[in-house]
Amino acid sequence: MTDEIPWGPTGELVYNRTYARTKPDGSKETWPETVERVVDGNLALVDRRHMLEGEREDLVRLMTKFKVLPAGRHLWASGVKNAQHLFNCWVAGWPEKISDHFQFTFMRLMEGGGVGANYSNHYLEGYPEVVNPLRVEIVCDPEHVDYQAMKDVGILSEHYSHDWAGAYAIEDSREGWAAALVDLIDTHYRPGTVHYQRVYDVSRIRPQGAKLKTFGGVASGPLPFAVMLQKVANIFSEYAGITLDGIAAMEVDHAIAQCVVAGGVRRSARMSMMHWDDYQIDKFINIKASTGEHWTTNISVEVDDEFWRLAKEGYGSFAVAREDMPKQKRAHRVLKALSEGAVRNGEPGMWDSSLSNVGEPNRVVCTNPCGEITLEPWEPCNLGHINLAAFVTPAGKTDYLDLIRAHRLMTRFLIRATFSEVADPKSREVLDRNRRIGVGHLGVASYLALTGSRYSEAPGDKRFTQFLREMAAEVDSEAERFAHDLRIPVPVKKRTIAPTGTVAKMPGVSEGIHPIFSRYFIRRVRFNLNSDMAELRRLAAEGYEIEKDLFAPNTEVVSIPTKDTLVQAVEELGWDEEIVESADELTLHQLLAFQALYQMCWADNAVSFTANVHPDAYEAEDVAADLKRFAGLIKGSTIFPESSFPQAPYERITKQQYESAAAKAVEDGVDEECANGACPIK
């Protein structure tokens, strides 16, 4: 059966590591078994009378051959009894009680999802002042397996015993951990508090290394959670007598994410945003460099129509009113920071809230961590993808009939997914109201090359732009038909482009709409020490370079010399490899033009796209000029310089360097990190 599955070079490895579930007999699923589980689980979400004739068979066929692929969370959780957590990422809002924000963030991250939040201070200014400074005291039964480790690092209280009846006993569950966090935060705001030591008993928390069944991975033990409680208490205590501001709230969420990343399979994924005219915007933009922290999040600046109006005009322009000049100065300063960050290390990114809110029934406030879906507070993203490259015939033509069928079926798949359970009533309300879905494309660069087209020429190719509009119309019409059949609102928006990092690796096609990074490169893959040790040992035995991750705990980095698989495919067709254009052969203008093409002709949601550039090829002024040129045409931007930090996800090498390494060609050119064009959330 394996030979019949069109795996990419590392596709089976990625599947076995990420999506294959353990069966009752202890063996792992095969890909056909996963497909049947996913399809049957999805179809069971609505009454069978709403199923099309042959719909199950078509979905199984298309998914088995990697022609359609739902987002990784569907592959992992669809059809799993009592664990159908089908949504990848969320946006956390700012409700009446501030602890609800942090509880929501903690719960979604512990479930393996990603969380975005907008930390602009106008969202926090209505909260009351922090009342009480508190000191967290941690106690634990000496019989606990991790007791000595906690004692050795000095986390345990010297003043309280685990036998004290007044200690808060933390239950060993996600809900129990979140409840303790809420208790701590609410105590900071509770008038009349007499005792400023809050004692938490972690004796019931399972020890480090215990297996986690629902979401995979292993337990981190009580230590990271205890550290988080102390960090959170320290942050709130610093604000006793004043209102928590956006930067402080961001620090709390970072502490929460650090706790989550300490155990389990996945790294935490977050998006942090702040409005360009916020009084803390300069501190926000420089927060990673100035603190050495906040590695759990991507950061983006929220801009809007006013920002572009002011940024496009020169100082002293008669088009800018005198009272707007201070704002204009800030707009120019922020644009300069965006542009300098792009050529320095890729951050911050940019998100256009004015353009993103066009067509929205209610205000969207942030994106998911990878930036392809703009969301209301508490709303999840719900993604599925069409692999365009899989519909190219051996003659280099497009199988339009099957491609149209694929777009329609993925639309129906995602609408059904909106009926799945969610843990938070706030999310249920917005999900029922919006029914937002995100049908996307992957393998786009592969599709263009395999049909004889150059990536750089696509924005000016009327046939390709018409093709995108026709496929978009198929999604929209099917969404309307199916929603009416189900008697639910038509999805508010339906089409997107996601980075598709992990799922694209299974068929081995280009990720999302990205060009290949380079024909030859070193790709660095992150592995979790707790859950991926067997694979790490195998790769070490094969001679790959392995080193500790400099940024994330419990993680090792494997360096793999790689020849891009698309180059191989083109060579096998007898074509010149130069029809495959890599990122280093494309200008920033050409890259942003391709993003704008997909934003205008395909996506009503957003387009997640990383323009990878050589840092020596562009000055900040060049980036600013292109950002202004594409203002109003793209909803966000991430411009990322190659090799901008140690252990960069990819590093360009020459053909000669690749051949001298005598390495097996294993993958295409974009890594799994959100900030660099792909997503770690499965």
From Swiss-Prot:
Disulfide bond entries: 89-381
Top EC group: oxidoreductase
EC number(s) from the headed UniProt entry: 1.17.4.2
Pfam family, one: RNR_Alpha
Cofactors named for this entry: adenosylcob(III)alamin
Keywords, comma-separated and alphabetical: Cobalamin, Cobalt, Disulfide bond, DNA replication, Oxidoreductase, Redox-active center
Catalytic activity: a 2'-deoxyribonucleoside 5'-triphosphate + [thioredoxin]-disulfide + H2O = a ribonucleoside 5'-triphosphate + [thioredoxin]-dithiol
Any one Gene Ontology BP term: DNA replication
Active site: 370, 372
Coiled-coil parts of chain: none
Molecular-function annotations in GO: cobalamin binding; nucleotide binding; ribonucleoside-diphosphate reductase activity, thioredoxin disulfide as acceptor; ribonucleoside-triphosphate reductase (thioredoxin) activity
Protein's recorded name: Putative adenosylcobalamin-dependent ribonucleoside-triphosphate reductase
The organism of origin for this protein: Mycobacterium phage L5
Gene behind the chain: 50
